[in-house]
């Protein structure tokens, strides 16, 4: 049984992870921890369904609400403030936390020698030099699970030349505010235009 901790369990990645676990063979995975910032009602429903050992809630008011609600139905579930505990009890940590807030989850998982299913790109972009040495800890492993970096990972692992070191990767933008623009029009792009990146529902 793989013990799974899900940081950002009420976000897109977290919900998809729970869907996969729900549809897997019974006994294949056990959700041992769920983590949210402030989505109290959603995480209470998830906790009642998956019966984790701990629920991490960053926001104090939301944490108090979650603790009250679970105390009546699931008193064995511990409600805590810090996400670091998750990686101690899990075999696999899914990091679906948005932004720089996900760095502590990434670092704790790797320091504890866990497999990290990483959707939080900011951990590597903003703190790559800090995170990279942690990969050398026995058992520590990063598996990219979101969008482009997962696709690259799969391509590299399926290549007949996978033993060779990759010297350079080029990622092309498939969308964004400048899709369809010609080179001449890109010369006068403003900061405001560059920041107007489209978003979509996952």
Residue ranges and their predicted role:
Residues 131-149, 168-169:
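Rossmann-fold dehydrogenase core element
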Residues 16-26, 45-46, 124-139, 155-158:
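Active-site-proximal loop->helix
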Residues 51-53, 74-77, 112-115, 137-140:
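A short helix->loop->beta-strand "cap" motif at the edges of active sites that frequently abuts
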Residues 149-202:
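Conserved anion/nucleotide-ligand pocket segment
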Residues 62-64, 123-127, 149-151, 176-178:
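Short gly/pro/ser/thr-enriched loop/turn and capping motifs at secondary-structure boundaries
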Residues 1-100:
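N-terminal glycine-/serine-/threonine-rich beta1-alpha1-beta2 phosphate-ribose binding loop
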Residues 58-59, 119-121:
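Short beta->alpha connector loops at strand-helix junctions that form conserved
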Residues 66, 100-112, 121-140:
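Rossmann-fold NAD(P)-binding glycine/threonine-rich loop
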């Amino acid at each position: 049984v793989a013990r799974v901790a899900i940081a950002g369990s009420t976000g897109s990645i977290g919900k998809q992870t729970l869907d996969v676990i729900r549809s897997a063979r019974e006994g294949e995975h056990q959700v041992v921890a769920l983590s949210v910032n402030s989505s109290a009602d959603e995480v209470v429903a998830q906790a009642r369904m998956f019966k984790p050992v701990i629920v991490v809630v960053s926001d104090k008011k939301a944490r108090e609400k979650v603790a009250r609600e679970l105390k009546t139905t699931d008193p064995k579930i511990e409600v805590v403030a810090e996400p670091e505990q998750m990686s101690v009890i899990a075999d696999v940590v899914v990091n679906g936390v948005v932004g720089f807030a996900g760095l502590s989850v990434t670092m704790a998982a790797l320091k504890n020698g866990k497999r990290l299913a990483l959707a939080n790109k900011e951990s590597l972009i903003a703190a790559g030099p800090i995170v990279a040495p942690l990969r050398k800890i026995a058992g520590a492993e990063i598996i990219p699970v979101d969008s482009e970096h997962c696709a690259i990972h799969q391509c590299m692992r399926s290549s007949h030349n996978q033993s060779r070191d990759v010297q350079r990767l080029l990622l092309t933008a498939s969308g964004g505010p400048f899709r369809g623009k010609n080179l001449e029009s890109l010369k006068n792009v403003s900061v405001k235009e560059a920041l107007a990146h489209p978003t979509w529902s996952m």
